[in-house]
């Protein structure tokens, strides 16, 4: 074989090593756009002009140098043979082309976005009427409705926030008394629930004490206060039976018990249940009518 052919084969071999190195660098995520040699670019250009797949394998580069379809040993090469190495090389070149085209598209898209951003920044801070006029007169709004519409909506939102921060305090001044009244009512209801829980707790304690024969404890009224000093303490069922009608009504009103004006003996029974005297001896005790005056 002539010396020139050996030199061509050696050049092809070195070029193949460069391609393998570029493929390894591509797998590692490194830049490989400058690793393709001049001979490979020539092969790609001719293949694209003929609308044929690019063959950057060792054999394809050898055919480009010698213009003969031969392999490394000078034997005739079957062009229909789909070598996996050739397929990988073509895929590698195609990925490079897509990468370069995507970079170009990315730069152009970035420039377009920056241009739209500058245009949005130049928009005047105005009301919705001015914003609608800008939308109608802007030729890019029909092409890019979502971006510009979101930007203008954001402008209106900022203006609304400014209005709320500056105008809302003055407009809310008339509502302050009603808000304070609502807060006061809430606190009062909270206190009432707390007093009701305290009364129920003392009532439960009396039920346990009376079941074991102990006297009852004083149960606070529904408003949280204790019975007045002029009222007798209710320790046993006899204390309830000795109450006058006025005293019994005072206790019943303090505990928030609904009554009927015609009730007589039932008032004492309701008071007995309200303070927790539910033992067997208490329930079986027969109460008398009201005394005309408190016992001395």
Swiss-Prot record:
What is known about what this protein does? Has a role in meiosis.
Presence of the UniProt keyword Cytoplasm in the record: yes
Its BP terms in the Gene Ontology are: meiotic cell cycle
Q: Does the keyword Cytoplasm apply?
A: yes
Pfam families annotated for this entry?
Mug135_C (PF08593)
Among InterPro entries, the record links this protein to:
Mug135-like_C
Where does the record place it? Answer: Cytoplasm; Nucleus
Q: Which organism is it from?
A: Schizosaccharomyces pombe (strain 972 / ATCC 24843)
Its name, as the record gives it, is Meiotically up-regulated gene 2 protein
Q: Which family does it belong to?
A: Belongs to the UPF0612 family.
């Amino acid at each position: 074989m002539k010396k020139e052919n050996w030199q061509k084969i050696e050049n092809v071999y070195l070029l193949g090593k460069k391609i393998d190195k570029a493929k390894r660098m591509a797998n590692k995520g490194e830049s490989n756009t400058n690793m393709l040699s001049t001979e490979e670019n020539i092969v790609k250009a001719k293949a694209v002009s003929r609308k044929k797949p690019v063959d950057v394998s060792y054999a394809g580069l050898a055919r480009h140098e010698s213009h003969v379809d031969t392999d490394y040993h000078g034997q005739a090469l079957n062009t229909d043979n789909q070598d996996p190495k050739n397929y990988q090389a073509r895929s590698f070149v195609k990925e490079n082309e897509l990468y370069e085209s995507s970079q170009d598209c990315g730069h152009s898209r970035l420039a377009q976005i920056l241009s739209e951003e500058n245009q949005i920044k130049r928009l005047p801070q105005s009301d919705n009427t001015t914003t609608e006029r800008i939308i109608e007169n802007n030729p890019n709004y029909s092409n890019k409705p979502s971006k510009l519409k979101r930007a203008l909506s954001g402008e209106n939102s900022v203006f609304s926030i400014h209005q709320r921060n500056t105008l809302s305090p003055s407009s809310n001044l008339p509502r302050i008394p009603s808000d304070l009244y609502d807060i006061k009512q809430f606190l009062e209801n909270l206190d009432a629930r707390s007093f009701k829980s305290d009364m129920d707790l003392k009532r439960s304690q009396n039920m346990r004490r009376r079941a074991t024969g102990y006297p009852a404890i004083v149960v606070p009224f529904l408003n949280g206060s204790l019975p007045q000093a002029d009222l007798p303490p209710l320790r046993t069922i006899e204390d309830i039976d000795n109450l006058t009608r006025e005293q019994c009504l005072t206790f019943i009103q303090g505990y928030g018990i609904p009554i009927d004006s015609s009730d007589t003996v039932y008032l004492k029974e309701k008071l007995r249940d309200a303070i927790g005297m539910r033992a067997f001896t208490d329930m079986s005790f027969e109460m008398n009518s009201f005394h005309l005056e408190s016992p001395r």
